[in-house]
Amino acid sequence: MDFSIEQKYQELLKIISSVSRETMQDLMHFESLIIQWNKHINLISSSTIPLLWTRHILDSAQIYPLHSDLLHWCDLGSGGGFPAIVIAIFMKEKKTGHIDLVESNGKKVAFLRTVIAQLDLPATVYHCRIEDVTQKIKNPEVITARGLACLDDLLRLIFPLLTQKTIALLQKGRDYSKEIKNASANWQFDLLKHKSKIDENSVILEISQVRSFRG
């Protein structure tokens, strides 16, 4: 869908009520870098390029307001930078907070570091597997993941990073109820469900106080 810049800005304001023009410019710059780099490496499915603003950028933008008061974020399997780069752009506007990105693919790491440098974002990229990052990232207040794994596997991945105060914000599609049921066989957790503002079939699962039945 070919939105004008003003249309994109108005759509963004439906997600976040106050956005500076400088932040809008950063988001547009990020969008252009995605399109440019996606010709050479698979950051997002090429079929979603026409929907890049809504399906990826706005979908990511809705995450940050849920806990914008918390300062140390960590995004797992960051890929093309959704939601991590979008979150970092809003942190830059707020002049507070930092997000750590974890990505194992070297080409995607190069892309993420390029974006962070060009936009001067409060973010650090760790080029490693998620399982190996626990010695590098300590006590994140918020953990995010988008399209990474089923909930049961996600909880296994994030569990070593969790503290009593850590919140996980996990974006899930239409099968989220089944994923919750399957994960509940192995894990106990406190759960809040936030309906997506972009896709009526999707949710953001806010998970805390994760306990494993397996000890």
From Swiss-Prot:
Gene Ontology MF term list: rRNA (guanine-N7-)-methyltransferase activity
Catalytic activity: guanosine(527) in 16S rRNA + S-adenosyl-L-methionine = N(7)-methylguanosine(527) in 16S rRNA + S-adenosyl-L-homocysteine
GO cellular component: cytosol
A Pfam family the protein falls into: GidB
Residues that hold S-adenosyl-L-methionine according to the record: 77, 82, 130-131, 146
Location in or out of the cell: Cytoplasm
Keywords: Cytoplasm, Methyltransferase, rRNA processing, S-adenosyl-L-methionine, Transferase
UniProt keyword Transcription present: no
Protein transport among keywords: no
The EC number(s) this enzyme carries: 2.1.1.170
InterPro entries: rRNA_ssu_MeTfrase_G, SAM-dependent_MTases_sf
Function: Specifically methylates the N7 position of guanine in position 527 of 16S rRNA.
NCBIfam families: rsmG_gidB
Family label: Belongs to the methyltransferase superfamily. RNA methyltransferase RsmG family.
Protein name as catalogued: Ribosomal RNA small subunit methyltransferase G
Gene source species: Bartonella henselae (strain ATCC 49882 / DSM 28221 / CCUG 30454 / Houston 1)
